[in-house]
UniProtKB/Swiss-Prot annotation:
Keyword Protein biosynthesis part of the UniProt annotation: no
Protein name: RNA polymerase sigma-54 factor
BP-aspect Gene Ontology terms: DNA-templated transcription initiation
Taxonomic superkingdom: Bacteria
Record-linked NCBIfam families: PRK05932.1-3, PRK12469.1, rpoN_sigma
UniProt biased composition (Basic and acidic residues): 49-68
Keyword Ribosomal protein in annotation: no
Species annotation: Caulobacter vibrioides (strain ATCC 19089 / CIP 103742 / CB 15)
Residue ranges of DNA binding: 380-399
Length: 497
């Protein structure tokens, strides 16, 4: 076959993502702190932008019904703008990104390299994301990885998220669990059960409320926590004073045993969380606020304190436009004007989109707001996206690094999403975490060899309860919870007898 050169003209359709639309999409996933920093950089770069120092307008507010199926929130008036911002860019090719017609890989919550944030809003560098990959994990991230593997029920998982946020850099829990139970409207025993699970996480000793509990957790892990050790931990002040006679008397041991005990105590780590990368503490400011109104309605509104307010200085634009002489000066003024107008529009779209998504989440999870953490419903991104007519990727960006203040506390919007398993009777779906909780409950109820359930038997019991689940799924959940097989459980019971 002969090779030859020729020209062809082809017509086709393709997705074109301009740098400006790229910027608008990126703004969606920024936290209010990151957004404020970005706007500040734009104010310094663009002379036509100025901060609006006037009085804030009343917060945009919508109402959500308690019954999620009754009404649909109409929070965004500018539907055309909303559709622009909702462009699904997840499948744009690397080649398009290189030419500025695509967008870089979407990583919800990824770090932005602010040194490259100017120039019309192009985010072409992944340096910040690459740096994040090489950084050592934070203590909170390490704990959340273990939380996923723990396969807790929705209620326990929700409480665990709050407890993780309350752990300081040393690994200590800085939260009163009695107050937490009261705030969440749940039994104290539920919080205590969750804390007990979390105290089994690595590093050993994490989630302790004081030094004594921290050391006790580590000794229990080493199988060295006995009455003598408990007595020593109850009188650590004597150890600090080096009152050996007092310790011998209280612990009931001789000199040799006492020396061994002290050596073991000194080998422990009183700050188990210190080995992990720590983040500077930041004040948590909610992006959205929800309060209960009359007639079973929930009022959802934006927190105007977190919304950067910028204006285009039209007078200054007119003045510099008249003074522009060269083509380069005129181009610069035109670019600044276009960039300023787009930023103002993008910020408005961002605010409306956040409100729309948050309102739907409130309607879906009204049970949690009204009755407490045990009433969290199974919810995923697709459900919210379909309800408000947006793309899943948009909902994902909106819920990253955004917080909502509720009567039960401040939560990240992603807190309200839990997976589900379909009902065998066609009814409401079951949370996957709640199914794992049911499996654990069945195993915990086994008292003798005859009570031990095989995976097949567990499937039968769950199907009788309306949960449609396969045997391999039961086995997967059981293994994730580190529950031995039925054969192993029978053997352990026989040995215990």
């Amino acid at each position: 076959m002969a090779l030859s050169h020729r020209l062809e003209l082809r017509q086709g359709q393709g997705l074109v993502i301009t740098p400006q639309l790229q910027q608008a999409i990126k703004l969606l996933q920024l936290s209010n702190i990151e957004l404020d920093a970005f706007v500040e950089a734009e104010l310094e770069r663009n002379p036509l932008l100025q901060r609006d120092e006037g009085d804030h307008e009343p917060a945009v507010e919508v109402e959500a019904e308690r019954d999620a199926s009754l009404t649909q929130v109409d929070a965004v008036a500018d539907t055309t703008a909303g559709r622009e911002l909702d462009t699904p860019v997840d499948d744009v090719s690397p080649g398009e990104r290189a030419t500025g017609e695509g967008t870089d890989a979407e990583h919800a919550g990824g770090q932005i390299d602010w040194s490259r944030a100017g120039g019309g809003g192009s985010f072409e560098s992944d340096e910040g994301y690459e740096r994040a990959l090489t950084d050592s994990p934070t203590l909170a991230a390490h704990l959340r990885t273990q939380l996923v593997q723990a396969a807790l029920s929705p209620a326990h998982n929700a409480i665990a998220e709050i407890l993780i946020d309350a752990v300081d850099e040393g690994g200590y829990l800085r939260l009163d669990i009695v107050e937490l139970a009261d705030r969440l409207g749940c039994a104290l025993a539920l919080v205590e059960e969750t804390l007990s699970v979390l105290q089994g996480f690595e590093p050993v000793g994490v989630f302790a409320r004081d030094v004594r509990e921290c050391l006790a957790l580590q000794l229990k892990d080493l199988n060295r926590y006995d009455p003598a050790m408990a007595a020593m931990l109850d009188h650590l002040e004597l150890l600090a004073k080096r009152d050996m006679a007092g310790l011998r008397r209280i612990c009931g041991v001789d000199d040799e045993d006492l020396r061994e005990m002290i050596g073991e105590i000194r080998s422990l780590n009183p700050r188990p969380g210190a080995a992990y990368h720590s983040e500077p503490a930041e004040t948590l400011v909610p992006d959205v606020m929800v309060r209960e109104g009359l007639g079973g309605m929930w009022h959802v509104e934006l927190n105007t304190d977190t919304l950067p307010r910028v204006l285009v200085d039209q007078r200054y634009h007119a003045r510099v436009s008249k003074g522009a002489r060269s083509d380069q000066e005129k181009t610069f003024v035109a670019d600044c004007m276009a960039s300023a107008n787009w930023l103002v529009k993008s910020l408005d779209q961002r605010a409306k989109t956040i409100l729309k998504v948050a309102s739907e989440i409130v309607r879906q999870q009204d049970g949690f707001l009204a009755f407490g953490v045990e009433h969290l419903r199974p919810l995923n991104l697709k459900t919210v996206a379909d309800a408000i007519g947006m793309h899943e990727s948009t909902v994902s960006r909106v819920t990253s690094n955004k917080y909502i203040a509720t009567p039960r506390g401040v939560f990240e919007l992603k807190f309200f999403f839990t997976s589900a398993i379909q009902s065998s009777e066609g009814g409401e779906a079951h949370s996957a975490a709640s199914v794992r909780h049911k499996i654990k409950g069945l195993v915990d109820a086994e008292k003798c060899e005859a009570d031990v359930h095989s995976d097949d038997r567990i499937v039968e019991i769950l199907k009788a309860a309306g949960v449609d689940i396969a045997r391999r799924t039961v086995a997967k959940y059981r293994e994730a919870m580190r529950i031995p097989s039925s054969v192993e459980r029978r053997r352990l019971m026989k040995e215990a007898v």
